[in-house]
């Protein structure tokens, strides 16, 4: 460990005492490891483990998927009621087949509404319908001839319900198959064997480098500067802080690689210093973890320098960490997401997964159906916060939360955004309970975490996304949120957490709109986009494809939109739950199966709509047409239910700017 002057002096002083080669160094030599085929053995073991790890990962994803499907199915039944479905799946069919039938049904419903089909076109449409019925009978057991004489919305609902059931059964089979395959493989033992083989190879290489009467040089302090190449040969790995990395050895010293950990907490200027002494760099960090702290005094100085020297925004030392800067300066730098998560209960970490990581994490822990894994407790309404301290929330923690926790006190943590609340909680609770701000909890974990938000109305400070991500992900087994019962802003992160908790705990929504059945409609969206790609010659489909691609690009480009997703062609009746705001004509229009939203951007955490987008063909939607009148109705309905709407014309421009 070098870096600071004190570290270097300590290294020199203790070098002779601590720098000892192993007494049995000769035993490190392994004749087998000298053989050319020995690395191939390691490669073979690695490939075997890769295969097992891949199956373990897929098993975790399947468990994650079936849990999401199960929760969504419960909400579907709560919001639409139970219904006997007479459709039965044939053994040779799959959930993908049912999605295709649903998609085709929707196309027929749209054509049916059109009065423009005449003569040969109408005849061809009838033939297509007959062929569809024949094909659907090969996929499903249709109960009777009257099945297809019903309203198309009822037929589609049957396909949706059968899809849920079929997909659930498919996932159960996949999980069972993977569990049986993995039961016959001892991954831990195979990993141990590979580690042993790799260690033999490493030790053998170290023996050839440092054994065989290799002189053990003892360096002086000036050697670190004047003889740095020899120091590097003897000590190929050097530890240092980013700030001191340049001065660990001579300033001209160059390293093959620099590995920078916790880069989200490194300042831009010190990170740049560290880069200047390496040929290659591996930057490790998480932009959704807490960034480095910059004091107000330093911010003022850094902003002055930035303005005076015309420093580009992507090098903003006052407001960005080194990791954020790297991502902006080199947006196409190769990135690897460490996807596997082993700490938290699935229901806890999946909030962070959906909110901050776009659903890309693979949750390797198991959900065994435990109760009260993630809970929110609202205090009574009122102004209970005083100077960043909230006694009412402390009382709730002491009297309602802690009695329900069965862990040892040293396995419980309380997180607060303000030091005054931390001090007050410490005074009220047992000494063994760890109470601190989020910054002091980063890198740690507890069986149970209690988060007190303090503010009567959530502020930008207590709602900071990085703070919330770290706070939630400290909890291994249970997480409690204690929050004011006052109405909170709907678009804040804490509100998303509350909505996530309520949804996953099966709370029945009292909203006038349905929660978004994203598992169902994400699958449908994939099927529809695949269908549209086969019909690019039809202009309306082409515009839908282009809009979908545009929306995907917008969401991918913005890190703050990771919690958003897109579904297409959502019927309005799947969105409107309470028709009391509508008149008779509007209700009839909203309930029509063909009244749909072209694209809906929704919050994958709260399952609530964020923005509706319509793609309007100029001729079809121009003023005075029947479609224009329907557009006015749809605009009014969405406005009544507080759902923002953007209309994009096929002859318009600046679509990306309009949507953002």
Q: Where do the PLM segments sit?
A:
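A short beta-strand element within the Helicase C-terminal
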Residues: 253-259, 444-455, 470, 478-481
